[in-house]
Amino acid sequence: MRRITLILMFLVVLMVFSATAYAQKEWLVGDFIEANANTRGITRLTLSADDQIHVWGKCHPSDCDWGWVPVDTYGPDVSADLQAAAKYVSAIYQPGFARTFVIVKPLDENKIQVEVFTKFTDHSRRTPYMFRQILIRREDMALKP
């Protein structure tokens, strides 16, 4: 547990000191998809206005539904208005065999970067891993400039 806490603290510090433009929280709400049909990662991600995330991962024959979990939103400082200056949201998935941290960063009105960190908890000796990908807002859900 201490190790997980240290990892989370490291990720938060990394996010705070990274050079990222601020975004309206509205940019983080919506349905996003992976443009590459051959992805081995996340295929779809939905962020709701009530601070929930729903993720689907690549599986065969149909995508794996990770379900809805709450997100935490991060701003540039302790007094930031998160509606106007959201920098990241994060969520934790715990399906029983692993603990997965999902970190979402808005890139622009219709594009997000997703980083996924997975640590296996089932004593399988599988190596913890991470991947990063860019998802685009579904065209029928795109924000109008």
What are these regions (language model features)?
Residues 108-110:
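Residue-level recognition of beta-strand termini and adjacent short loop/turns
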Residues 72-75, 118-145:
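Edge beta-strand at a domain terminus
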Residues 23-32:
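Cleaved targeting-peptide boundary
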Residues 112-114:
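Cysteine-centric segments in proteins
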Residues 7-16:
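Bacterial N-terminal signal peptides
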Residues 17-23:
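Sec/Tat signal peptide C-region and signal peptidase I cleavage site
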Residues 1-4:
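Positively charged n-region of N-terminal signal peptides that target proteins for export
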Residues 34-100, 140:
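Central antiparallel beta-sheet cores of small beta-barrel/beta-sandwich binding domains
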